[in-house]
């Protein structure tokens, strides 16, 4: 039986996404609307994490932290909109780290609750948060170039680089015992004769391949290269989620 903790996955996604929201907006080069977009999205995901946890399997610290992430994102959103209405274009980027810090506490609780080797569980949860957050924000930033065409490509390069740097950590975390290798050897039954283990491997290899191709696309001079890179990042989101969720779902069963 495949089992996946939806509340933890949604909280990971929200925390990782907000961490890379700060990463991109910290130099105040991106328009305020990009921050509004990301805070709104991750506010909803954190609320869904809290609701899923309360409805399915309560981990008290995780659910309280998810609610805190909602409030942290909402506070940042309100402050940014209020400053804009007063004619102040700058936003204090440090506010975006508040929901990240609160959410990190919830992720620790979720990792401990998952059981197994605590160090491996923590590594998987935080690597997954960074992995999913980086690839999602990269795709969203690619779209933002339609709104703000003069934005330096360097910002998108940095997010794609971040996906590339987090990728080996994510892959190693999933290979550590008890990990994907156990699916390949048959020690862990995926219910499909090891097929899901090979599907995970295909997702992992394809993800880093898409990172390389996206970097190559961004080196082209034409503006359409950014849109091509964004399309590739759509595919990378699918394979990145396969890399993180397939392994965790099978190993948690």
Could you say what each language-model-derived stretch is?
Residues 157:
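Basic (Lys/Arg-enriched) interaction patch that binds polyanionic ligands
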């Amino acid at each position: 039986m495949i089992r996946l903790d939806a509340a933890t996955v949604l909280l990971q996604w929200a925390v990782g996404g907000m961490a890379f929201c700060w990463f991109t907006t910290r130099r105040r080069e991106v328009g305020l609307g990009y921050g509004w977009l990301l805070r709104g999205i991750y506010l909803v995901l954190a609320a869904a994490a809290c609701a899923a946890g309360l409805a399915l399997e309560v981990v008290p610290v995780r659910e309280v932290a998810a609610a805190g992430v909602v409030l942290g994102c909402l506070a940042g959103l309100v402050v940014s909109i209020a400053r804009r209405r007063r004619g102040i274009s700058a936003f204090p980027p440090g506010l975006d780290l508040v929901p990240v810090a609160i959410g990190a506490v919830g992720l620790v609780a979720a990792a401990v609750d998952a059981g197994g080797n605590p160090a491996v569980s923590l590594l998987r949860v935080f690597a997954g948060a960074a992995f999913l957050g980086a690839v999602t924000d990269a795709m969203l930033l690619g779209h933002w170039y339609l709104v703000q065409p003069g934005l330096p490509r360097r910002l998108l390069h940095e997010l794609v680089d971040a996906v590339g740097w987090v990728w080996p950590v994510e892959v190693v975390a999933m290979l550590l015992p008890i990990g994907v290798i156990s699916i390949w050897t048959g020690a862990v039954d995926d219910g499909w004769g090891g097929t899901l283990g090979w599907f995970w491997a295909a997702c992992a290899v394809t993800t880093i391949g898409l990172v390389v191709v996206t970097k190559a696309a961004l080196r082209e001079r034409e503006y359409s290269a950014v849109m091509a890179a964004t399309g590739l990042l759509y595919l990378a989101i699918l394979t990145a989620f396969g890399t993180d969720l397939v392994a965790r779902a099978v190993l948690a069963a």
